[in-house]
Amino acid sequence: MWIYLILMVALVIIDQVIKAAIVSHIALGASTSIVTGLLSLTNLHNNGAAWSILEGKMWFFYLISVIALIVMGYLLWRLRGKWLYEVGISLMIAGTLGNFIDRLRIGYVVDMFQLDFINFPIFNFADSCLTVGVIFILIGVLRDDSFEK
């Protein structure tokens, strides 16, 4: 269980360091191409969710974050010993914490990764942790034979 706590802390630190670097090196709204036509770094302040849904509804995000962290903490404890679930939930907790810290500390989430080849919301490292965490959990569900009984 300790390894997952270390993983979560490391991922939250990485998320916060990336966000601090973006804010200090890229002007708000500016963009820098990393791989032409593929990936740019942008400094975007997001006080909503993807596609700006629920923009400005911070109370909602605070509430959902706290509830999600409680539920995921319980599931992490309940599903201990099933490594795919443990990794997935740990990634999701780290992602939730990374964005929750932003909302509490500065009132918005810093997003930076822009996919230039598709119309997709700009996202951050914490969002990536959430997405990869969901993938681990889906793989765990597909491989878990206890659901077949």
UniProtKB/Swiss-Prot annotation:
Q: Name one GO biological process term.
A: proteolysis
Listed under catalytic activity are:
Release of signal peptides from bacterial membrane prolipoproteins. Hydrolyzes -Xaa-Yaa-Zaa-|-(S,diacylglyceryl)Cys-, in which Xaa is hydrophobic (preferably Leu), and Yaa (Ala or Ser) and Zaa (Gly or Ala) have small, neutral side chains
- Family under the similarity heading: Belongs to the peptidase A8 family.
Q: What is one cellular component GO term in this UniProt entry?
A: plasma membrane
PROSITE patterns according to UniProt: SPASE_II
Q: Which UniProt keywords are present, listed alphabetically?
A: Aspartyl protease, Cell membrane, Hydrolase, Membrane, Protease, Transmembrane, Transmembrane helix
Gene, per the UniProt record: lspA
Q: What is its EC number?
A: 3.4.23.36
What membrane topology does the UniProt entry give? Multi-pass membrane protein
What HAMAP family does this protein map onto?
LspA
Any transmembrane segments, and where? 24-44, 57-77, 81-101, 122-142
Give the metabolic or biological pathway.
Protein modification; lipoprotein biosynthesis (signal peptide cleavage)
Which compartment or compartments is the protein found in?
Answer: Cell membrane
Q: Which purpose does this protein serve, as stated in its record?
A: This protein specifically catalyzes the removal of signal peptides from prolipoproteins.
Q: What GO MF terms are annotated?
A: aspartic-type endopeptidase activity
One Pfam entry for this protein is Peptidase_A8
Q: Identify the catalytic residues.
A: D111, D127
Say where the protein is mainly found.
membrane
Taxonomy-wise, where does this protein's organism fall, top ranks first? Bacteria, Bacillati, Bacillota, Bacilli, Lactobacillales
- Official protein name in the record: Lipoprotein signal peptidase
